[in-house]
Swiss-Prot record:
Lineage of source species: Bacteria, Pseudomonadati, Pseudomonadota, Betaproteobacteria, Rhodocyclales
Pathway connected to this protein: Nucleotide-sugar biosynthesis; ADP-L-glycero-beta-D-manno-heptose biosynthesis; ADP-L-glycero-beta-D-manno-heptose from D-glycero-beta-D-manno-heptose 7-phosphate: step 4/4
Name of the top EC class for this enzyme: isomerase
Cofactor note: Binds 1 NADP(+) per subunit.
Active-site residues, Swiss-Prot/TrEMBL: 139, 177
Cofactor(s) annotated in UniProt: NADP(+)
Gene Ontology molecular function terms on file: ADP-glyceromanno-heptose 6-epimerase activity; NADP binding
GO biological process terms, semicolon-separated: ADP-L-glycero-beta-D-manno-heptose biosynthetic process; carbohydrate metabolic process
Protein name (database record): ADP-L-glycero-D-manno-heptose-6-epimerase
KW tRNA processing (keyword) present: no
Keyword Isomerase: yes
Chain sites annotated for binding NADP(+): 10-11, 31-32, 38, 53, 75-79, 143, 169, 177
Length: 319
């Protein structure tokens, strides 16, 4: 059996789809379906069972078994970068993951967990090393602290444990995330609603819409996860991005190009940069994927010119 925590969420449900594509259906999905809309992410998936995350955590902390477990993909977390309830974030993102690590290591079960590029703060270097890590919010700090925890104990661990520092992921099954969904998702909806896009004006020395992020399609994220499943000797913390920064304007133009002829207008409106985000906003990210390549991963990554149209095709079938 393979366990996927956060399996009804964005990346988790796509990992389930990726496993299904391999013919793997002996999957235990762990999640919190308080927001029942997330069940739609699993409506076309084949799984063995579902378990509420609180029940799962109680069983993990009680050191109970779940039968033979091949691997754990730990994607469950509070992913809101604007959540400042530190006790809540630390309980969900840090303590939960520590408990799961102890359970997995004791049984030599591979644990592949979601970290985040947010640990790097404002950058400008995005490499998996302590001197470049400067988290700016509770979410980032919780991810950073667990990465530090792993580093302390890694020398004594003889099973696979991998932290994946996801950069700006976009793609299918993120609709439940609301304001935290990708700009590609919001651009699609804006064009459907009004035919125009809204982007922030310039900040931190960047012109209007010229802030840059490393945007990675969720299919590429899944490919990295499945490669790690196939390569249990690979361990450590790795950036998962394309290795190329692209501007929000480039994402916007990819969306506009796809929508061309199907919507009225098609312009971009630049809006004032929010004051509450100044000093807390990553205006530039670009994954250094040297470590991932050196570990042996050879897969190619989609630029936004390819990934965004692919995603919008998927969304259009469900509009």
């Amino acid at each position: 059996m393979i366990i996927v925590t956060g399996g009804a969420g964005f990346i988790g449900s796509n990992i389930v789809q990726g496993l299904n594509a391999r013919g793997i259906t002996d999957i235990l999905v762990v999640d919190d379906l308080t927001d029942g809309h997330k069940c739609l992410n699993l409506a076309d998936a084949d799984i063995h069972d579902y378990m509420d995350k609180d029940d799962f955590l109680r069983r993990v902390e009680a050191n109970e078994d779940f039968g033979p477990v091949e691997a754990i993909f730990h994607e469950g977390a509070c992913s809101s970068t604007t959540e400042w309830d530190g006790r809540f974030v630390m309980a969900v993102n840090y303590e939960y993951t520590k408990s799961l690590l102890g359970w997995a290591v004791a049984r030599k079960v591979p644990l592949l967990y979601a970290s985040s590029a947010s640990v790097y703060g404002m950058g400008p270097t995005f490499r998996e090393s302590r001197e470049f890590e400067h988290p700016l919010n509770m979410y980032a700090y919780s991810k950073f602290l667990f990465d530090c925890h792993l580093r302390r104990f890694a020398p004594g661990i003889d099973s696979q444990v991998v932290g994946l520092r996801y950069f700006n992921v976009y793609g299918p099954r993120e609709q439940h995330k609301g304001s935290m969904a990708s700009v590609a998702y919001h651009f699609h909806n804006q064009l459907n609603d009004s035919g125009r896009l809204r982007l922030f004006e310039g900040a931190d020395g960047y012109g209007p819409g010229e802030q840059q992020r490393d945007f990675i399609h969720v299919d590429d994220v899944v490919a990295v996860n499945l490669w790690l499943l196939d390569n249990p000797g690979v361990r450590g913390i790795f950036n998962v991005g394309t290795g190329r920064a692209q501007s929000f304007n480039e994402v916007a133009h990819a969306a506009l190009s796809w929508h061309k002829g199907s919507t009225a207008g098609g312009g971009i409106d630049y809006i004032a940069f929010p004051e509450h985000l100044r000093g807390r906003y990553q205006s530039y990210t670009q994954a250094d994927i040297t470590a991932l390549r050196q570990a042996g991963y050879e897969g190619e990554f989609m630029p936004v010119e390819v990934g965004v149209p692919r995603y919008l095709e998927w969304l259009a079938l469900r509009d």
